[in-house]
Amino acid sequence: MPFQTPPPVSAPVPSISAPAAVIGAPVRAQYGWGYAGPDGEGVGTLSLLMEAASGRLVIELHAPGERLLLLEGDSASGYRLQVPRQKVDQRAPYLAQLPLPFLPQVLSVEGLLHLLRTGEGAGVSVQKKDAQGPLKLHWRGKDPRGKDEQVWLDRKRWEEGE
């Protein structure tokens, strides 16, 4: 019988709410999105592709007729954030170094997955749940200027696996 070596101490701890078979597998999700803040209000669609194992992340936020935000990258090559309306085009080696306009701030892809799977995060409340987890989320926080803003997410699609 071959010996198994334990995982390195730095290995991420799997989420309790995620089945063991899908830890690290890609997660595709889509949410209805609503926003209220100092610069106005808006609605749209938030689409995400998340891979915790590689740190790969693609986020697209669309309002009717325009893309508000595109964030893509992975933990090996870094992340790029584009916000055309605000003329933002930023790169950073770590997700935590990028401001996420119109969304709650997260430190990592694992943190974003945890927030969406459990509804746990600073300023986040779960308004409705189903068997898969939070169906409707509400976030209340501050923008980079210290002004109040709110985001509502209504899950439309959640797919785990290849």
Residue ranges and their predicted role:
Residues 54-107:
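An acidic-aromatic
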Residues 47-51, 71-72, 123-130:
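Short, exposed beta-strand/loop patches in secreted or surface proteins that constitute
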Residues 1-47, 158-161:
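N-terminal leader/targeting segments and the immediate start of mature chains
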Residues 113-162:
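Gly/Pro-enriched, hydrophobic low-complexity segments
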Residues 32-38, 64-66, 84-87, 144:
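Hydrophobic lipid-interacting interfaces of membrane-associated proteins
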Residues 35-41, 58-64, 113-120:
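Short, solvent-exposed secondary-structure boundary motifs
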Residues 16, 24-26, 49, 94-104, ...:
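Polar alpha-helical coiled-coil and adjacent low-complexity
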Residues 27-33, 42-50, 55-61, 77-79, ...:
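One face of beta-strands
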